């Protein structure tokens, strides 16, 4: 039986947005079980956007969220860090439209979160159970999900030179 987690105490960092180049202060705050991950634009009177598929914005260069015309961009590294270490509930405050890029990976976010530690909450974690394979294709691109006994992710991408397949 797995339970939801938040962080033990607030943590913050500063950086610049990858695409905007704008300075941004990011602060992550613990929150009650069942809240989920919620982004709060403190520069817009605390406007909130839940990290949910229904708020996913169609932006080709980053994982972005949008609600009522308000955008939060480049969320993928922080969201990956949350999933990777098991943070289910947090408020993410930022004072600009884009999260800081830091070193371009999830690692600085992981280190920042591990530094403050996790707090187990008294609510069981709910998980999506995949019962049959699902594939979505668009041209030569595809994504697939398959039933499994445990969480596992494989990812591949093929760029033109000089990067190639990774």
Question: Which residues fall in each region the model found?
Answer:
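Short acidic-hydrophobic catalytic motif
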Residues: 1-166
């Amino acid at each position: 039986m797995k339970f939801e987690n938040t962080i033990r105490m607030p943590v913050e960092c500063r950086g610049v947005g990858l695409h905007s180049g704008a300075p941004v202060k990011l602060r992550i705050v613990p929150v009650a079980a069942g809240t989920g991950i919620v982004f709060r634009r403190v520069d817009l009177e605390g406007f909130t956007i839940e990290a949910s598929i229904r708020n996913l914005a169609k932006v080709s260069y980053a994982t972005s969220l949008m609600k009522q015309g308000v955008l939060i961009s480049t969320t993928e590294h922080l969201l990956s860090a949350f999933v990777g270490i098991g943070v289910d509930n947090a408020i993410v405050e930022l004072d600009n439209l884009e999260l800081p890029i830091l070193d371009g990976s999830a690692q600085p976010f992981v280190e920042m979160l591990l530094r403050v530690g996790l707090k187990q909450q008294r609510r069981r974690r709910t998980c999506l159970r995949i019962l049959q394979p699902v594939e979505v294709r668009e041209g030569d691109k595809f994504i697939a999900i398959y039933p499994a006994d445990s969480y596992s992710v494989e990812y591949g991408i093929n760029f033109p030179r000089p990067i190639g397949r990774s």
